[in-house]
Amino acid sequence: MILELDCGNSFIKWRVLRAEAGALIAEGVVDSDGALVDNLRSLEKVSLVKCRLVSVRTEDETNLLIGLLKQEFGISVVCAAPAREMSGVKNGYDDYERLGLDRWLAMLGGFHLAKGACLVLDFGTAVTADFISADGEHLGGFICPGMPLMRNQLRTHTRKIRYGDLAAERALTSQAPGRNTVEAVERGCSLMLRGFVLTQLEMARSYWGDDYRVFITGGDAELVSDVAPEARVVSDLVFVGLAMACPLS
């Protein structure tokens, strides 16, 4: 069985696949290496053989996790690496190694699914947008703070803004002007993300008219999915690209 990991800034997304058919056996999201090991050990009748992962962590943090996986499960680990070109997609950064690996894999996955021009929007700790033309040319992209960063900055630097995650979730049941601080903050941040999406769609149309696909991924994808009804929400888009970048026989 194959373990796949997407090690982000705040969480580790994991899933276990059956090696022969690629069928999904189990999946989850954890906030630490220890929690990952606990989750995997709790699975019944699961025998891990190989692992492929993508990480935006520091090299030391990634190596610690790899060492832990080898120690606990005795499996080989393959890491996604930067590339100038792969699977028909040409990296658009001047220094290709500086492009975040999660963005790169999401682009590979999006282009593979689109079979043509596409806009890839990822809503995690940070929000990213990337434009890939029909011939696979990465035209560049944008990065801005995601919902967690905007929320935490306001909580940290504004003394009177204090509320919990449950209050934040309740506040997002509407987009009407807030009648209290939590509603005002959460809905204001949400509207910023929605405005970001609309700007990206406008730019994509200026490039390709209506001849392109839109993919939305990331933990907060559902907050903006209604802004782009034509978009396809693909929660595992990074994993689609990971399988392309790190094929395991």
UniProtKB/Swiss-Prot annotation:
It comes from the Bacteria. Pathway: Cofactor biosynthesis; coenzyme A biosynthesis; CoA from (R)-pantothenate: step 1/5. ATP binds at residues 6-13, 125. Its EC number is 2.7.1.33. It is found in: Cytoplasm. GO terms for molecular function: ATP binding; metal ion binding; pantothenate kinase activity. The active site is at residue 102. K(+) binds at residue 122. Keywords: ATP-binding, Coenzyme A biosynthesis, Cytoplasm, Kinase, Metal-binding, Nucleotide-binding, Potassium, Transferase. Transmembrane segments: none annotated. A monovalent cation. Ammonium or potassium. Belongs to the type III pantothenate kinase family. It holds the Pfam family Pan_kinase. Catalyzes the phosphorylation of pantothenate (Pan), the first step in CoA biosynthesis. Gene3D superfamilies: 3.30.420.40. GO terms for cellular component: cytoplasm. Its cofactor is NH4(+); K(+). Substrate binds at residues 93, 100-103, 181. GO terms for biological process: coenzyme A biosynthetic process. It catalyses: (R)-pantothenate + ATP = (R)-4'-phosphopantothenate + ADP + H(+). It comes from Pseudomonas fluorescens (strain Pf0-1). InterPro entries: ATPase_NBD, Type_III_PanK. Homodimer. Disulfide bonds: none annotated. The keyword Transferase applies. This is Type III pantothenate kinase.
